[in-house]
Each structure stands twice: as C-alpha cells, then as structure tokens.
C-alpha cells in the first residue's frame, strides 16, 4: 500500500491544536517551525499546499493568562481575536526562513453557504496558490457562535479541500489513526490502514471527544473524510508526532489511516450545495419521491412533498428528507416555504391556479439537486 499523497498535486493539511501548542499553553514555536520546514519541502516537489491550522484560542488563552478554556462564547471570541495575531506572526516568521509568503484567510461556514462569497473565496485561494503563497486558514471564531460551540477545523479542512478541488486532505492529530475500537479500552482493537471514506462502519468505530484544548475527536475526522470524498479527494489521518510525516507521506510511505474516495468529483455547483452545513429548511417527501430522486434521477415535484419545515426563500438550498426523517438529497428550491406549503401534494398543473403564477413545474429541478 502506497500513500495517496505521493500522487497528489494539491493538498490541504489540517494541523490540530495539540500539535501547534504547548499543551494549551500558547503556541509551540519549535513545532510550527517543523511544520513550516515540512511544507516547504513539499512545495519544493511541486505540490501546492493549503494549511488549516488550529491554535488561535489556545494562544489567546495564554496571552490573556487563562488556564482553562472558557465556556462563555464572548470570552472564546476574545481569546480567538487575541490569539490569531500570534498565530499569523509565528507562521509568517517560520515560512519566511524558506522565502515563502503566507496569507491569513479566516472563514466561516456562512462564507461558503453564499454562492457569491463561495466563488470569491475559491478565486482568492487559487490566486494565492498560483502566486506561490501558502494560505493559512482558520475559522473566524471572533464573529461566529455556533462554530465555536459545535464546529471543528476537521470539517473546515474538508470544506476547503472541496472548495479548491484538492486531491488530498491530510488530518494530523496526536493519534496514530483509526482503530476498530478504542485501543485504550479494548485490547482486541485493530488498526485500520485503509478503507473507503463514507463506509457506515467507520462512524461506529470512531468516538470519544478530543482534548480540553481542541474540540475534535476521531468521529469528526471520519465525517470530514466522508465530506472530502464527495469531491474525489482522499484523506489521510495520521499522527503529527511522526518525524517528517508530510515528507514521508509525499514519498509514498503508508502512515496512518487512508480513507479513499469511492467516487469521482461532483460538479462545482453540486459540491457547493452538498457543502451547506446550515440549511434554512427542508421538505419531507413520500416514498415514491424518494425512489424517483435516488434511483431515477428525477426532479422533485410538489406532489411528492408531504410537509414543509422551516422558512426559506426561492433560490435557497433546502434538504429533502424521507418519511423517516433521513436526508436523501438537497437542492435549490424554485419556490419559497410559504409557496411550497400551498402547492404541496398538488400536481404541477395546479401550481399556477393556486399561486397565481408559475415559476417552474418542479419544486427542485434535477440539475439543481444533489444526493447525500
């Protein structure tokens, strides 16, 4: 088995908090120096690298003299604002030793949910890569709340991979990779060297939370790999404690767990729809509509809609769920939630008489729909 990183041209590397901080006591400058050296080495082989780095909140806690991670959202936001300054300074200094420019890019999931902002972020990152710059990406924790409370940079790494159509995502952690069970509790736990991303059994294997400094456990990494696979990107989960781990992966050495993408890339438009993390609404559809969407490749017609949930406008991305509540697809709606409630369970021929106008005969056209 050879590392998929060897053939990858464009790589997103995610480094967790525990690998860039001194056990939460501010940034570990020596560790960051090693990451800069390894990424500079990758750049020397012709690979493009985007770095997703945690550590801002931990650095802010150190600068503010806080020993424990606060629970108040505004205190977390303040720590992120203070710490982001130090994070950018250290990376700029360390990469500068190799003549490499860096760029700070702070994103929120909302940036990637809006189509125009999504395309702007994509264009900016691709331009930076073409200029030989290494983008350093982090969540903009200072202006968001849900992401600090529930989010993680594993997910952000997958979103960025899809955004720039990366070939591979490398998630570096303080664990060796994925085991069939928690090796600390189960002596029969076996290491998983390679598997297909999105395999349901993987989520059952993963579990447990991260450290008190970081937020992500193994499950978030498995889900990130599943998301990255939708754009055809392979994921490697490996220990950042391994010496020269990036260089060895790029040389083809199999380190950690490889989660391979089972399918090819989605189109850019459908990838954008699939990457929405926060949807304004969803429709419950009947079993017949589920079958037509998932097996027949058909559009969603109003007659197949059983219930409309949430409030949304025409042109927004909404979820389509089975009668049991499982999301099966998502897409761009041709009608608002108020209009959808009026035309639900009705044939398309009655839309105009009910609403007084006809946008489209479909609630969601198949060209604007992606299966999940």
UniProtKB/Swiss-Prot annotation:
GO BP field: L-proline biosynthetic process
Subcellular location: Cytoplasm
GO cellular component, one term: cytosol
PUA domain sequence ranges: 280-358
Residues binding substrate: 54, 141, 153
Pfam families in alphabetical order: AA_kinase (PF00696), PUA (PF01472)
Pathway the protein takes part in: Amino-acid biosynthesis; L-proline biosynthesis; L-glutamate 5-semialdehyde from L-glutamate: step 1/2
Alphabetical UniProt keywords: Amino-acid biosynthesis, ATP-binding, Cytoplasm, Kinase, Nucleotide-binding, Proline biosynthesis, Transferase
Stated name of the protein: Glutamate 5-kinase
Keyword Cytoplasm: yes
Keyword ATP-binding: yes
Family: Belongs to the glutamate 5-kinase family.
């Amino acid at each position: 088995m050879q590392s998929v990183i060897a053939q990858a041209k464009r790589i997103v590397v995610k480094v967790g908090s525990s690998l860039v901080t001194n056990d939460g006591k501010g940034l570990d400058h020596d560790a960051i120096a090693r990451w800069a050296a390894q990424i500079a080495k990758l750049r020397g082989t012709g690979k493009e690298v985007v770095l997703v780095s945690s550590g801002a909140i931990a650095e802010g806690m150190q600068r503010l003299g806080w020993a424990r991670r606060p629970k108040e959202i505004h205190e977390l936001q303040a720590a992120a604002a203070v710490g982001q300054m130090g994070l950018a300074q250290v990376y700029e200094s360390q990469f500068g030793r190799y003549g490499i420019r860096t760029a700070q890019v702070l994103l929120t999931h909302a940036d990637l949910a809006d189509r125009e902002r999504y395309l702007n972020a994509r264009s900016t990152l691709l331009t930076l890569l073409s200029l030989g710059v290494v983008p350093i990406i982090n969540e903009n924790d200072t202006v968001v709340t849900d992401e600090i409370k529930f989010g993680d940079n594993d997910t952000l790494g997958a979103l960025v991979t899809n955004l720039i159509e990366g070939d591979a995502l490398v998630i570096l952690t303080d664990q060796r990779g994925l085991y069939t069970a928690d090796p600390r509790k189960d002596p029969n736990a076996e290491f998983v060297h390679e598997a297909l991303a999105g395999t349901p059994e993987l989520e059952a294997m993963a579990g447990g939370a991260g450290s008190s400094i970081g937020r992500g456990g193994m499950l978030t990494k498995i889900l990130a790999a599943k998301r990255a696979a939708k754009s055809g990107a392979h994921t490697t989960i490996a220990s950042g404690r391994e010496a020269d781990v990036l260089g060895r992966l790029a040389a083809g050495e199999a380190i950690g767990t490889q989660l391979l993408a089972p399918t090819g890339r989605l189109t850019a438009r459908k990838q954008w729809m699939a990457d929405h993390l926060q949807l304004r609404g969803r429709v419950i559809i009947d079993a017949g509509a589920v079958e037509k969407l998932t097996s027949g490749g058909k559009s969603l017609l109003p007659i197949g809609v059983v219930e409309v949930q949430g409030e949304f406008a025409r042109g927004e991305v909404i979820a389509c769920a089975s009668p049991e509540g499982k999301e099966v697809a998502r897409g761009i709606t041709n009608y608002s939630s108020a209009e959808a409630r009026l035309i639900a369970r009705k044939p398309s021929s009655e839309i105009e008489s009910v609403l007084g106008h006809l946008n489209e005969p479909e609630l969601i056209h198949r060209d604007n729909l992606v299966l999940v």
